[in-house]
């Protein structure tokens, strides 16, 4: 007797095979669900409660406000994140009339009375409400109505999500577009292929992906999530014997267009608008090459020649940072003046290139003598009056025998001394060089060279290693014998000399295309992101996040408040009940999905005879995508060496809460009583945790005793002294 095949299976030539078909059907909203949506909307409005508190700059709001100011000034800047969020906030402010010359410098500064900070926070809050509603519509695709409502309310009451959606930050909009991606992709998988609704959800998913990767660099994780799920789905389509190769190609091409081409088009368009709004030099100029900067309206062209006596700035070719010195000294070793790399244009980056003989100002300023390959020179630091110097002492960080400390020492009047002399070895030229002359004579922005110390025969170099706090966390500069060549390469970015005022001899650049700008900007973004290694009091490790070991002090007016101002503290902290539920359910899901996958590895295993899928199978089919989403949005942080903070866990937490919904739905399907008890326990616990921490979520009044009693974990460094005033 032939065994009855379950729904979705057909008999192939040798074995049953699973067909590709929508596994779920969309159901219309019932009256109960319509009432639930209305109720959820009302509950989510609590995110907008007293948005005006505090009327001061909170945490990373300072960065967004400065970027808005840069847009008004047209001053170019560089950030680790793509510019969509900053552009949205900027265009919102353009709807209002206020003094564009506002000055906001640090966290805690009062917002000017006419600055529309409340409207900017309102936008973030509306994104938070949209995130809540989209979560409900996502959940009802695979969960029963009650579980969908419960989990959606958990999103409403998740303290960390509430906090970020009340402030001028990127996290609120980012969570909204991430939820837009998740909902539309899930809806897309339930549609009949090539219908109107199928096309709609397909392309809205692509648009949402474009917005997501244009808001935050972490949007790439969600992009990867869609990519993985799409590959799995295409594999299933390929295995369906009823689908022709041409239909498969159609599926493939449409997904490539929607999930790759559409997002990348949006992404590039956002950067184009970004560049158009920043035509002038600005705080980001120091990170950019002269070729890029030559496209800016107020870029000052530099003399092409470099003469002895020229005041120059020297940049590291790989790191794009300035050779720099200042009055600070090394705390050990020579105890002489520090030499470092610095990110920004500064007077302390200026050096005078001199001959190796005793300084003769009249000769240097009147003789037009060019610096050539093989010349031996000295570099005089204008701001501090000392010469670049190497001595036989180990550097403060790289304490190897083949390494030497680089410092500033001696002043004008110095006689010939090899410890202060460097041979210029010209190696290659920049791509924008017009001829081979930069390989013979030192040319501004064109010649890439090494500086070889005459006494020790070591190469002046720098690397990504940074000095501690006594060195202002600037990059270490040292001298090394036989180093890696890229670390030893330098170029002259700017040059000035009294004899070089002929405008016909200024350096001109060929056209720098939009794509070249885009590539260079991303190199800078990558280096900036990698360079966030300076110690921070509220940095944490990814392993601390799921168990909420510590939070982040977003704001305290302890030292800021006026006489009639109430104490206010915002401490970024998640909902303990939700975080722990997500953590333990994640462990359970990993175990269950691993077991189920192992059982299903045999392609010749007979499918279950029941025409109705078991709760276990439903749990696996609906939970593994969210488990993958949590994994992709969390694990990469464990591999990063940069500073990380609890708010980096938000995207993973969002997937974790969706995973929690599948587990509760599974428990209720298995046993309504046990499932109901687990669901009710988590729900009530989450409400309790939210209520207990409302004051530090919203910045509302509290007391010292109440604050101290809410330090549930030893690492929760909540500044309760805020409430003593």
From Swiss-Prot:
It is found in: Endoplasmic reticulum membrane. It holds the Pfam family PMT. Induction: Expressed at very low levels. It is a multi-pass membrane protein. Residues 303-356, 368-427, 439-495 form the MIR domain. It catalyses: a di-trans,poly-cis-dolichyl beta-D-mannosyl phosphate + L-seryl-[protein] = 3-O-(alpha-D-mannosyl)-L-seryl-[protein] + a di-trans,poly-cis-dolichyl phosphate + H(+); a di-trans,poly-cis-dolichyl beta-D-mannosyl phosphate + L-threonyl-[protein] = 3-O-(alpha-D-mannosyl)-L-threonyl-[protein] + a di-trans,poly-cis-dolichyl phosphate + H(+). The chain crosses the membrane at residues 34-54, 117-137, 145-165, 192-212, 219-239, 256-276, 570-590, 619-639, 644-664, 673-693. The keyword Signal does not apply. Glycans are attached at residue 409. Pathway: Protein modification; protein glycosylation. It comes from the Eukaryota. Its EC number is 2.4.1.109. GO terms for molecular function: dolichyl-phosphate-mannose-protein mannosyltransferase activity. InterPro entries: GlyclTrfase_39-like, Glyco_trans_39/83, MIR_dom_sf, MIR_motif, PMT_4TMC. One of its GO terms (cellular component) is plasma membrane. Disulfide bonds: none annotated. Protein mannosyltransferase (PMT) involved in hyphal morphogenesis and drug sensitivity. Transfers mannose from Dol-P-mannose to Ser or Thr residues on proteins. PMT1, PMT2 and PMT4 account for most of the protein-O-glycosylation activity, while PMT5 and PMT6 may specifically modulate a much narrower spectrum of target proteins. Required for biofilm formation. This is Dolichyl-phosphate-mannose--protein mannosyltransferase 5. It comes from Candida albicans (strain SC5314 / ATCC MYA-2876) (Yeast).
């Amino acid at each position: 007797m032939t065994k009855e095949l379950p729904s979705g299976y057909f008999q192939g030539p040798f074995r049953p095979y699973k067909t590709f078909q929508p596994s779920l059907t969309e159901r219309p909203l019932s009256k109960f669900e319509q009432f639930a949506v209305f109720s959820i909307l009302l509950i989510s409005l609590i995110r907008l409660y007293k948005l005006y508190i505090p009327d001061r700059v909170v945490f990373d709001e300072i960065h967004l406000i400065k970027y808005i100011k840069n847009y008004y000034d047209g001053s170019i800047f560089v950030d680790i994140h793509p510019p969509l969020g900053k552009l949205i906030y900027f265009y919102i402010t353009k709807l209002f009339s206020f003094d564009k010359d506002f000055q906001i410098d640090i966290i805690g500064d009062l917002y000017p009375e006419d600055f529309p900070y409340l409207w900017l926070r309102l936008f973030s809050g509306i994104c938070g409400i949209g995130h809540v509603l989209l979560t409900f519509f996502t959940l009802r695709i695979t969960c029963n109505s009650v579980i969908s409502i419960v989990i959606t309310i958990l999103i409403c009451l998740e303290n960390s999500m509430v906090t970020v959606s009340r402030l001028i930050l990127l996290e609120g909009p980012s969570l909204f577009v991430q939820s837009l991606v998740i909902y539309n992709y899930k809806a897309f998988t339930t549609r009949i292929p090539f219908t109107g609704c199928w096309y709609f959800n397909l392309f809205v998913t692509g648009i949402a992906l474009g917005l997501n990767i244009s808001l935050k660099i972490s949007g790439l994780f969600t992009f990867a999530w869609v990519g993985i799920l799409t590959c799995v789905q295409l594999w299933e389509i390929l295995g369906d014997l009823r689908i022709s190769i041409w239909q498969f190609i159609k599926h493939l091409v449409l997904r490539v267009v929607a999930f790759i081409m559409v997002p990348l088009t949006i992404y590039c368009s956002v950067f184009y608008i970004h560049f158009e709004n920043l035509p002038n030099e600005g705080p980001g100029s120091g990170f950019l090459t002269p070729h890029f900067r030559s496209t800016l309206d107020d870029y000052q062209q530099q003399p092409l020649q470099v003469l002895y006596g020229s005041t120059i700035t020297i940049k590291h070719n790989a790191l794009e940072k300035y050779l720099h010195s200042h009055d600070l000294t090394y705390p050990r070793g020579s105890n002489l003046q520090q030499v470092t790399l610095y990110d920004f244009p500064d007077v302390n980056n200026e050096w005078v290139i001199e001959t190796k003989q005793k300084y003769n100002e009249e000769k240097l300023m009147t003789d037009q003598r060019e610096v050539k390959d093989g010349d031996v020179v000295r570099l005089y630091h204008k701001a501090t009056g000392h010469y670049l110097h190497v001595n036989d002492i180990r550097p403060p960080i790289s304490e190897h025998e083949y390494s030497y400390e680089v410092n500033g020492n001696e002043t004008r009047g110095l006689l010939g001394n090899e410890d202060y002399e460097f041979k210029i070895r010209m190696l290659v030229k920049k791509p924008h060089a017009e001829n081979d002359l930069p390989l013979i004579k030192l040319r501004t922005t064109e010649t890439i060279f090494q500086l070889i110390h005459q006494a020790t025969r070591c190469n002046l170099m720098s690397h990504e290693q940074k000095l501690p706090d006594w060195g202002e966390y600037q990059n270490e500069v040292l001298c090394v014998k036989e180093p890696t060549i890229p670390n030893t390469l330098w170029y002259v970015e700017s040059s000035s000399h009294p004899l070089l005022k002929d405008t016909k001899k200024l350096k001109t650049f060929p056209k720098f295309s939009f794509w070249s700008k885009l590539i260079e900007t991303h190199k800078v973004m990558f280096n900036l992101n990698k360079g966030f290694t300076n110690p921070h009091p509220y940095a944490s490790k990814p392993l601390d996040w799921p168990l909420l070991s510590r939070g982040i002090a977003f704001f305290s007016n302890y030292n800021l408040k006026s006489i009639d101002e109430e104490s206010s503290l915002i401490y970024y902290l998640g909902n303990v009940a939700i975080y722990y539920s997500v953590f333990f359910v994640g462990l359970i899901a990993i175990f269950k999905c691993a077991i189920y996958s192992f059982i299903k590895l045999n392609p010749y295993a007979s499918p279950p005879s029941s025409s109705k899928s078991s709760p276990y199978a439903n749990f696996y089919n609906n939970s593994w995508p969210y488990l993958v989403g949590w994994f992709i949005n969390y694990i990469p942080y464990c591999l990063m060496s940069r500073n990380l903070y609890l708010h980096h866990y938000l995207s993973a937490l969002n997937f974790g809460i969706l995973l929690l919904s599948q587990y509760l739905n599974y428990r209720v399907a298995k046993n309504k009583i046990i499932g109901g008890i687990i669901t009710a326990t988590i729900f009530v616990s989450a409400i309790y945790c939210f209520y207990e921490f409302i004051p530090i979520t919203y910045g509302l009044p509290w007391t010292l005793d109440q604050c101290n009693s809410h330090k549930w974990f030893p690492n929760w460094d909540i500044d309760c002294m805020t409430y003593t005033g």
